[in-house]
Amino acid sequence: MINNVVLVGRMTKDAELRYTPSQVAVATFTLAVNRTFKSQNGEREADFINCVIWRQPAENLANWAKKGALIGVTGRIQTRNYENQQGQRVYVTEVVADNFQMLESRATREGGSTGSFNGGFNNNTSSSNSYSAPAQQTPNFGRDDSPFGNSNPMDISDDDLPF
């Protein structure tokens, strides 16, 4: 069976970071995720999805992702229940995030630069460090040569085309 969730959305407010009695970090947050279709009056609706993230990724999220941040989240969906103060059973469905990734720079979000930026923060939960080697000049191998650069017409008939 598969229980896999991938979301891209904006944080509706700053994450709420707490610690369990055994000092395990847990952060809760809500993502506003646009639907792919528009309503009858032409407006795009959004779903507000409750999420929870644990341990070091929770601390990273609380430190780096603020209200309005565009983030990508991977994880699983879970339903839990508890009894409230009135004795009623309450069911909660939420996404348990394994990791997240910032999808835009702070400058872009705040209206500064409009250039392309990959976010620069990939919160991979693996324990290995990922350091990149210094950039090296790669050989061109003729990539700048256009195969259509000589502008000679091609001798091909319509019968030779597969479509």
UniProtKB/Swiss-Prot annotation:
Stretches with biased composition (Polar residues): 131-140
Motif (Important for interaction with partner proteins): 158-163
Biased composition (Low complexity): 119-130
InterPro entries (UniProt xref): NA-bd_OB-fold, Primosome_PriB/ssb, ssDNA-bd
Positions of the SSB domain: 1-104
PROSITE patterns cross-referenced by the UniProt entry: SSB (PS50935)
Keywords: DNA damage, DNA recombination, DNA repair, DNA replication, DNA-binding
Superkingdom of this protein's organism: Bacteria
Name of one Pfam family that matches: SSB
Gene Ontology CC terms: nucleoid
Region (Disordered): 109-163
Keyword DNA-binding: yes
A GO molecular function held by the record: single-stranded DNA binding
GO biological-process terms attached to the record: DNA recombination; DNA repair; DNA replication
PANTHER family associated with the record: SINGLE-STRANDED DNA-BINDING PROTEIN
The protein's role, per its UniProt record: Plays an important role in DNA replication, recombination and repair. Binds to ssDNA and to an array of partner proteins to recruit them to their sites of action during DNA metabolism.
Subunit record text: Homotetramer.
NCBIfam families the UniProt entry points to: PRK07275.1 (NF005580), ssb (TIGR00621)
Protein's recorded name: Single-stranded DNA-binding protein
Record gene name: ssb3
